[in-house]
């Protein structure tokens, strides 16, 4: 496995692989890798000959009071995990390589509708930053396939739309959420949780499952179900950001006729923001 830091190096190596007829898969990450990330790498390896994992803590997708400065940078440990998972190439650029003229002068990609609401409402500018850097990575790597986790459900929808709308020839693949034994979705930010908070955190997934069970039993009073879920989170000691029942394709509020539903949740536990989701077919 090789690690490169410049776009020039990246393109030179990938040109050689393409001349050999190899297919290329991309797994974009911000590093601080866990088993969820590694599952994406394995999925990419199943679907392509060469796997490129990018490690870049993207400043454009962080808000003013978020954890850009404290987000863990663990490149050496990440490299060890990736090598063991069958990754081929690590692209770990610095900020200057991606944004040579600075963020203020950077062309930005805005994905309408699907990026609005939910995390888009709570984190203004976040999906603009995600869409911009992912579009750049698609252009830099020119992958045949790219793998993203379903844990970030709205992000996956944003990326699928941008690839479709901008006619980028890449197959965007979603990979199932990897969970701890108690149901907590694996996340780089779980490391911020105290021992006490870690014991409380599984209530997020339990609340999703309980609400999904209610829907499976035929309930369609979505606003009441959403409030019940927020109340359950609050009673457990979390501060709900949102709990929304949406159409799985549009991410708009679900109607009684919708058959494909997704439950989206974000909640603070202490200072840590946890997100999760669960999709069902009725």
From Swiss-Prot:
| Binding residues for (R)-pantoate | 61, 155
Identify the residues that bind beta-alanine: 61
Name the catalytic site residues. 37 (proton donor)
- Give the InterPro entries listed for this entry: Pantoate_ligase, Pantoate_ligase_C, Rossmann-like_a/b/a_fold
Transmembrane domains' residue ranges: none
Q: In which pathway does it act?
A: Cofactor biosynthesis; (R)-pantothenate biosynthesis; (R)-pantothenate from (R)-pantoate and beta-alanine: step 1/1
Q: Where does ATP bind?
A: 30-37, 149-152, 178, 186-189
| A cellular-component GO term for this protein | cytosol
Annotated EC: 6.3.2.1
A Gene Ontology molecular-function term?
A: pantoate-beta-alanine ligase activity
> Which reactions does this protein catalyse?
(R)-pantoate + beta-alanine + ATP = (R)-pantothenate + AMP + diphosphate + H(+)
Keywords annotated in UniProt: ATP-binding, Cytoplasm, Ligase, Nucleotide-binding, Pantothenate biosynthesis
Compartments reported by the entry: Cytoplasm
Please provide an example of a Pfam family that matches this protein in its UniProt record: Pantoate_ligase
Q: Locate the coiled-coil region(s) and give their ranges.
A: none
Q: From its record, what is one biological process in GO terms?
A: pantothenate biosynthetic process
List the CDD domains hit by this protein, alphabetically: PanC
NCBIfam families found in the cross-reference section: panC
Task: Describe its partners and assembly state.
Answer: Homodimer.
Instruction: Give the misc comment.
Output: The reaction proceeds by a bi uni uni bi ping pong mechanism.
Q: What does this protein do?
A: Catalyzes the condensation of pantoate with beta-alanine in an ATP-dependent reaction via a pantoyl-adenylate intermediate.
The similarity annotation says: Belongs to the pantothenate synthetase family.
Protein name, entry field: Pantothenate synthetase
What is the originating organism of this protein? Answer: Marinobacter nauticus (strain ATCC 700491 / DSM 11845 / VT8)
